[in-house]
Amino acid sequence: MKVFAIGDLHLSGNPPTKPMDIFGPHWDNHWARIKEHWANNVTDDDIVFLVGDMSWALRLDEAACDLQEIASMPGKKYMIRGNHDYWWSSANKMRNLMGDAITFLQGYGTAELIQTEEGPRIIAFGGTRAYLCPGDSHFSPETDQSIYERELMRTESALQEMDRAVETLLEQLTAETNMETTGSETSEPLTIDIHTTPVTKLLLLHYPPFNESNAPSGFTDLMEQYKVDTCIFGHLHDQISFKRIPKEFGTTKLELVSADYLDFTLKQIM
């Protein structure tokens, strides 16, 4: 099993009602290019993280065609909200529309046991939109501070749920191990050592976790506090930003996955 990520698909129906090539020729036919790479590299057993700005639609019913396009692609898909996802609705409404085809995350975290080339591994993941950070040139304390603080709360909620999900998964694996070791002699040999199985924490955000100066923020504090291994985010679309993003912040690896930054391919995270 592999883990991929991409953000900022900016879909608008087929044919698109808002073609992205208005932002430059590099966006020409971008969804077809993404789909080709996706279909050729991702299997149904893989995980795909979608970190916001999926559709230009304003309402959930208008976004349905874009979401169904995404759902038709291979892999188990997890999606967070971006700043342009105005169609985003309640969890129940989105679940009723898409069923199990896409799992929508907002201040939510979970964990899964996956099989990688290096062996079994637990990945804990979750996230939310995040927001502009104090010190950013577009940040206004009067209007943005409360939104920033709300997104910090959602981020911490996701991180706490990730930790609880890991504990629950380990308890389940322990119970299964005990059952197998006390079972019949015909039991299959164990392939998972719960004491040595590594855990990787992946935080999904739409906005980067810092301002234009890459200064520490409440998001980076949470990354340190909860020992996040990798933070995956999008939102950025200019060469200056592409060049300024560091590879790491503290002990957390950073992965920028805006579609145009990735040249309209998916980034393999694991």
Predicted regions span which residues?
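Core catalytic region of metal-dependent phosphoesterases/phosphodiesterases
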Residues: 2, 16-116, 215-226, 257-258
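Active-site-proximal segments of metal-dependent phosphoesterases and phosphodiesterases across multiple
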Residues: 19-21, 60, 66-69, 132-142, ...
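Active-site environment of divalent metal-dependent phosphoester hydrolases
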Residues: 10-15, 55-61, 83-91, 111-112, ...
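Binuclear metal-dependent phosphoesterase catalytic core
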Residues: 16-21, 35-36, 92, 110-119, ...
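Active-site-proximal beta-strand elements of phosphoester/diester hydrolases
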Residues: 2-13, 122-134, 202-204, 253-258
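Binuclear metal-dependent hydrolase catalytic cores centered on His/Asp/Glu-rich metal-binding motifs
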Residues: 24-28, 119-183, 189-194, 269
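A general structural motif
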Residues: 45, 74-76, 120-122, 196-200, ...
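Generic enzyme active-site microenvironment
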Residues: 6, 51, 80, 204, ...
